[in-house]
Amino acid sequence: MPIAGTKYAPFPAPQLDDRTWPSKRIEKAPIWCSVDLRDGNQALIDPMGHDRKERMFRLLIDMGFPEIEIGFPSASQTDFDFCRWAIEQGDVPDDVDLQVLVQCRPELITRTFEALEGAKTPIIHFYNSTSELQRRVVFAKDVGGIKQIATDAAKMIMDMAAKAGGGYRFQYSPESFTGTELDVALEICNAVIEIVKPTPDNKLIVNLPSTVEMNTPNVYADQIEWMCRNLDNRESLIISLHPHNDRGTGIAATELGLMAGADRGEGTLFGNGERTGNVDVVTLALNMYTQGIDPGLDCTDINRMKEVYEYSNQLKIAERHPYVGELVYTAFSGSHQDAINKGMKARRSANSPVWEVPYLPIDPQDVGRSYEAIIRINSQSGKGGIAYILQADYGLNLPRNLQVEFREIIQHITDEEGKELPSKRIYEEFQKLYVTQPDARIKFVDHHTYPHPEQKGRRILTAEITDNGVTKTIEGKGTGPIDGFVDALSKYLGVKMSVVDYSEHSLQQGSDASAISYVEMVYPGGKLFGVGINDNIVSASLEAVVSAANRVIAK
């Protein structure tokens, strides 16, 4: 690459030493305006036809956008026709205002009014570029010439609106605001304000776009705060943000801009738009939601939002895209999985409605996702993740030491295969190793106990087993069935074994629920677990002993 300092220069930043926005907090959602059907659409390789537009339009209405920019009706017949359809057949709710975009050119303004005939309180969004660079290299005009473009358009629009009987709302954008000197942007905006003559009951939207993101988000916030302080008739204005994402900080720029005094935000679903995209309204809304702020948009079916986005835009959403990507609610890291597992358990036992789960800033169910994909298993996963999957999907509450033991088994498989293991495969491996044991030598069949004739408190156990398919009867002594059965198997197999830990729980609710037992067995070579599942809790325990014994003799 060329030397940075010889090819590029930093963009100037305003001097605002008494800025107040850093101490502010976002306490309510802004007025949202979707520009998917205009800014988003113009950036597509294949712009939307009517069907794709209508599907996006319906979603935006269902989500609750109060303002929707539906196109640039003077720029193409397709946009003009869609504008007419939305007004005549779109069933637009009374609390939704349609917005259209138009350049400050007389013939385009005239066509725009034709497109809006019959609309309820439509917003006419007129704009012209004001940046120093475009004044110099695109328009070859001074500030006065650029201001006249804006004021001539404002006069024409106000005149045509009055002749049409009123009912219109107005929005002005000094396009490329972030590349415009603040005093120039202020001069042009104030000239437009003087012509429109907004009131507190009929406000003018002054949109201050970061058409190209040129600086850090704090600079944009300084620019917004400075404009909010200095614009004429501030109480009759709605200050709007329209950030792009060229530097990857569109979300932060919008949030800081709201802290700096803006009232409104324009953007697109998941950030579609020219170059690196417009700001992502969904991420903004859900960021607010996770801070306890009503976002003003309904994002409860994020899967539908994703499906419509991909159909209408013919674009794919990245797997790591905030809140919507396939992997954003998934942890592979062992320590993360363990923390999530413990957090979910703590939540189930807590009385508080407040969501507090490590590594999950939002409850996936709030946006229509399930808990199934929270934890997925690969070579980086730990015992907590595996335990969570077996508990969440199959109702197994593994003792901690069994979690550690089984994690080593799964770790070996994932290392060997080099890929993720799905939940079903993990359960199958658990069943094969501990429960069904298809290649096991010993199988439990039945048992009986009766009091020891000479030792009070002890019992004699006789058990029927099969050894490689051959039926055998074995006998042992102990304080109960498990103790006696371990004694019988130890003598029969010639291996000293004893139980050091035992636990059990039901697998379903109700009187006919199956029981699962976990037995940790110590033997001369170490310790390992066995697991048994049976409708009878005692039989489940003895099957767990056999499970452990089979693993001992297989060593």
From Swiss-Prot:
UniProt-recorded Gene Ontology molecular function terms: 2-isopropylmalate synthase activity; acetyl-CoA C-acetyltransferase activity; magnesium ion binding
Enzyme Commission number(s) of this protein: 2.3.3.13
Residues covered by the Pyruvate carboxyltransferase domain: 30-303
Name of this chain's protein: 2-isopropylmalate synthase
PROSITE patterns for the chain: AIPM_HOMOCIT_SYNTH_1, AIPM_HOMOCIT_SYNTH_2, PYR_CT
Top-tier EC class: transferase
Location of region: Regulatory domain: 437-555
Function: Catalyzes the condensation of the acetyl group of acetyl-CoA with 3-methyl-2-oxobutanoate (2-ketoisovalerate) to form 3-carboxy-3-hydroxy-4-methylpentanoate (2-isopropylmalate).
GO cellular component: cytoplasm
Catalytic activity: 3-methyl-2-oxobutanoate + acetyl-CoA + H2O = (2S)-2-isopropylmalate + CoA + H(+)
Principal location class: cytoplasm
